[in-house]
Every structure is written in C-alpha cells, then in structure tokens.
Curated annotation (Swiss-Prot):
Name listed for the protein in its UniProt record: UPF0329 protein ECU06_0080
InterPro entries: DUF3654 (IPR022115), UPF0329 (IPR011667)
Domain of life: Eukaryota
Residues that span the membrane, as ranges: none
Biased composition (Basic residues): 331-340, 372-384
Region (Disordered): 308-384
Sequence ranges of Basic and acidic residues compositional bias: 308-330
Organism: Encephalitozoon cuniculi (strain GB-M1)
Biased composition annotated in UniProt, kind: Acidic residues: 351-363
Family to which this protein belongs: Belongs to the UPF0329 family.
Length: 580
C-alpha cells in the first residue's frame, strides 16, 4: 500500500493486454479511503471501451470467443493480486524493504495459489465470473474457527513492523520531520489494524457476495437492450481515461469499482428486499457515487422500488380485469340472437374508463396512408422548435432502385457501386424517419444520449444515440439509433444522418465513443443542400406507420397498407435508465 500524509491511498490496478510482463499488472490511479469506507468490485471485466465478461459469463462461453479468452488470461492468473490491491492495497516501501520482503515470503505464493485454484474451479466447474470473484474473496480472507488464518497472521507481522518503525525514529531527524514521520506510520498502523478483525474480514466477503449476486440478477433479469442501456450510461473508464488518455485507455483491461460505507450497505441489504439492493447496485453502475449513498438515499431508493412494484401489481390487476371482461363479452355475444341496438350506460362508462386509462398511459400519433397525420388536439409545449431534414436522410424514403441510382452518381464514394441487394438491406436500417416524432418532442432527452460534438470536413457536428430493437419479420436486432446533426447558417438544427446500427453488448462501449463517431462519419456535408422542414415531413403514398410512446419506450410500427393487421417492421427505442 502506498500511503500519503493524512491517510492511506489505494491504487487502482489494470492488467496490461499488450505487453505481458511478469505480473501483467500496472497500478495507475489512486484514491483515498475514508474511515468506514470500503471498495467493492463489480464482476464486469472491460477491455478499453468494451465489456468482455459479464457476471454470468462461463468458461464455456469464453471458448466460443478466442479473442476474449486471450484478453482475459492476465486477469485469471492475477485475480487474487487484483482483489488484494482493491481491498487492501499494495506494499508500503521502506529503505530496508522489510514489508516487501514480508509480503513476498508470506503472501505472494499464497495469492498465486488462490488464483490457480480458483481458475481450475472456474474452468472445470463451469462457474460464472461472479462466482470466481466470490471465491477469490472467500479464500483470501478466510479465517478458521479460532480466529486465525493466513491473513490474520500476516496482519500481525505487519503491525509489529509498524510498531518497530514508530519506536525507532531516526535520530538525525529534526522535531518537525519526526512529527510527520510519527503521524505517517501511526496512520498506516491504524489502517492495517482495522483489518485485524474477523468481523471486518467477514464483512468484506459478505459485501462482495452481495454485490456479485445483485449484478448477476441484473444481467439475468434485463433484456439485452436494457443491459446495453445500462453500460452506455455508466461512468466507466473515467479515471482511467483521465490518467492514460483516450487511445491508451482503449487498449487496457480493468474492473470497475465503487467506494461505499460497508455498514450502511450491509444494513440496507438486511433491512430491505433484494430488489432494493439490486437497485442500489444499478445506480452505482449508472454513475452514482458510492460515498454519497447514505441511509436517507437508501430510503429514497426503497420508496422508488415500492412504487414500481405497486405499479406492476396495478397493471397486472388491470390486465386480468380486461381479460375477464373480454371473456364475458364473448360469452354474451354467443348467448344473444340479435345484436342490441342501444348501448347501456354501464358499457358507456366502461368505454370511457378505457379511453381515459389509455390516454394516461401512452400518447399515440399515427401517420395514415399517404402521410396524413392524425391530430391529437394538443399543441407542442416547446421541444426542438427548428428542425430540418437533410437530403441524405430523405433519400431513404425512395425505392431501392432510385436510392441506388442516386448513390451511384453521388459524392460519397463508400456508397458508389453497391449492389441492389445491399441497398435493400441498408434501406431497412436507414428508412426510420418516424424517429423524427421523438427527436422533435420534449421527451427526446429521456431517450437519446448526447455523445458530444466532433469536427470533420470543416463543420462541427453533434451525435445523439439511443438504444433500440429493430424487428423485421422474424429477425430481432438489438443496436443503437444514431442521429447526426449540425447547425445551419440560421442556427437551425439539421438532421444529416439517421440510422439503426446493429450492435451487441460487447461493442456498445466502442460504438458510443467519440472516436467511433468521427471515424464513421462522412468527410464532407453539403450544408448548402436544400433541406426539408421536419414539421412538413410525410412518407410517400402507400406507406403506413404508427408511433406509440409510453413510460419506457417509443415504438414505430410499419404496417402493410393492404392489410393493416400485418406488421412489416417495428422499431422500439428504449427510455434511458432512471437515475435516482
């Protein structure tokens, strides 16, 4: 552990993916632990922007991807050293190297054996990454019934070493330096002594098991697109990028962590349901500072979880009532010989109730055949006042043949000479102008993330991203909706790029990065090209689509104009995760 005056500093370690040195580890970023605080490690393993192992990842999963297996090798062989550095810290250095020698004699081999044995368990038992992490914690901090154990004996020897340093102050020091010296070693002793407790070591293991379990449940309980939204929003890589720079950080492997008050989090886990613990972990993954989690915040999260459960119960009850009502109506129709001319007051009330409930839960606007928008009677309360659509986006409304003809004679080289089949595939991904309904609304920020500005070809551009699912026939594709914009000479926002990019969990980090946006953007935008006012946009005749927006998603459904019961294509854009 490297200490500075006033308290201990723990070093974040990363494992080097490129140069496999003896340990494969580098210590990069430092942070300070306050009294009562502890580091928790999330069972997600990253390489640069991308995630290469989830809490649920098994060895059998890795065998299918040799690249990830190779990237994870340094982690597997150094797992116990990594956890040691997070939980305890690296060895303090002295002129005589006494603590370094003590660590090498007592802990080096011990930790190596743990890494090897846990790796065997992971491979042969086909365990998950979260189970591997739990096993590392259990074995490092294991204590026997008498209160002994390898860890406790090592701490005893370290404390004795600190006592010797405190008692034998160098005689050549003046009074001021002696005071600093004494404060330094006394603080170091106090920190190490805090681990000389069976209860504290048990807390370390219990806390990590709780976090691993919550992360595992999050991965198992969320659909892929929801999980992608979680990783797209998270505060991953910030400390690493600040220290190493964007390019260097993108090549490193690491685990994410949080600093929390262990007593408060453990008490919350015991007092509340597992759903509350899971939500707390989710909020930390989204970027909530663990040190800001106090009892008041936990109470707030518990109330949110309780309200969410009540809402689900109400929705379930409502669905059951509707199902029973439909069954009763069906039976009633069979029992009647003649259709009733009038409508009872009761049925009128039921109909009115259904309409009110539907309007409360979702807003619906549809574009009929030929693009005639159904009026809702509501005026816009603001949002994006000036919004135009560039010709690059509008061209995808046309037939594949006309699109190909236009692209072949256009300025963008990457589109020239593409086959008609390829253009048809790209039309599916680019012809999603129904997204404009959401982009122009007040709720756009609830769905789209602003990934920042970049400059290319002499113009400043901005990119908005949203997680979504595109369904075409039986194909279901997860990915991101990309919207590229720039400001014209009048200051109006112009949409020059719109597409659905098929993306998985593993690549979501890279796709969200500024480098990806710049590398995949067109070189030059014809900013003088005539643009269409988004408010006047309509699809060509023969196209029918509907947009539906509720609390959690925005949906666009394209239907067969000849048979509106047939859905040709659907795009669902996920709402960004709730931050409490």
């Amino acid at each position: 552990m490297r200490w500075k005056h006033g308290g201990p500093w723990v070093l974040i370690i990363i494992y080097n993916m490129i140069h496999h040195c003896s340990s494969g580890l580098e210590r990069i970023v430092s942070f300070k632990l306050e009294p009562g605080s502890q580091v928790i490690v999330f069972p997600f393993i990253f390489e640069g922007y991308n995630i290469i192992a989830l809490p649920t990842t098994k060895y059998s999963d890795l065998k299918k991807n040799p690249k990830d297996m190779k990237s994870l090798t340094p982690f597997f062989f150094n797992a116990s050293h990594i956890i040691w550095d997070f939980a305890i810290g690296s060895v303090i250095r002295t002129p005589d190297n006494r603590f370094e020698r003590l660590f090498n004699e007592r802990m080096e081999g011990y930790l190596k054996d743990i890494s090897v044995n846990v790796l065997k368990m992971y491979v042969k038992g086909n365990k998950t990454i979260s189970e591997l992490l739990e096993a590392v914690y259990e074995r490092i901090f294991r204590c026997d019934e008498k209160g002994g154990g390898h860890m406790m004996k090592y701490i005893e020897d370290v404390i004795k070493g600190f006592d010797d340093m405190i008692e034998n102050v160098p005689t050549e020091m003046d009074s001021e330096r002696k005071e600093i010296y004494h404060r330094f070693w006394s603080g170091s002793r106090k920190y190490v002594e805090s681990f000389y407790s069976i209860e504290r070591l048990k807390h370390l293991v219990e806390l990590e098991k709780m976090v691993c379990s919550a992360c595992r449940e999050i991965c198992l309980g969320l659909k892929e697109e929801k999980l992608m939204g979680l990783f797209a929003e998270g505060s991953m890589r910030k400390a690493l990028k600040a220290k190493l720079g964007e390019e260097e950080a993108s090549r490193r492997g690491y685990l994410e962590y949080a600093i929390i008050n262990d007593e408060i989090l453990l008490d919350a886990h015991r007092e509340h349901t597992g759903e509350v613990t899971k939500e707390l972990v989710m909020q930390m993954l989204l970027g909530k500072n663990g040190e800001e989690i106090d009892r008041r915040y936990i109470g707030k999260v518990a109330n949110v979880v309780k309200e969410r459960q009540k809402r689900r119960e109400r929705e379930m009850e409502k669905s059951m009532k509707e199902l029973l009502r439909d069954e009763e109506k069906a039976k009633s129709k069979k029992g009647r010989k003649k259709k009733s001319v009038g409508v009872s007051e009761t049925k009128k009330e039921e109909s009115e109730t259904e309409e009110v409930e539907a309007s409360e839960e979702m807003e619906i606007s549809s574009v009929e055949v030929g693009g005639a928008r159904r009026k809702t009677g509501k005026k816009s309360k603001g949002g994006r006042k000036c919004f135009k659509i560039h010709r690059r986006v509008l061209r995808w409304r046309k037939s594949p043949e006309k699109i190909k003809e236009e692209l072949d004679r256009g300025r963008e080289e990457r589109w020239r000479g593409k086959s008609l089949e390829y253009i048809k595939e790209q039309k599916v991904l680019h012809d999603i102008a129904g997204v404009l309904e959401l982009l122009r609304s007040e709720d756009a920020d609830k769905f789209f993330m602003d990934t920042g500005e970049h400059s290319k070809g002499g113009s400043s551009r901005r990119r908005l991203m949203a997680i979504g699912v595109l369904e075409v026939g039986r194909r279901r594709m997860t990915g991101v909706v990309e919207a590229g914009t720039f400001k014209d000479s009048s200051g109006c926002t112009v949409l020059y790029h719109l597409m659905f990019r098929v993306t998985g969990i593993e690549e979501i980090g890279s796709v969200m990065s500024p480098e990806f946006a710049e590398a995949n953007d067109i070189e030059k935008i014809d900013e003088d090209e005539e643009c269409q006012d988004a408010g006047k946009f309509v699809y060509p005749k023969g196209v029918r689509f509907e947009t539906v927006k509720d609390d959690d998603a925005f949906q666009i459904v394209w239907r067969n104009p000849s048979d509106t019961s047939e859905v040709l294509q659907g795009l669902t854009i996920q709402r960004r995760p709730y931050v409490i």
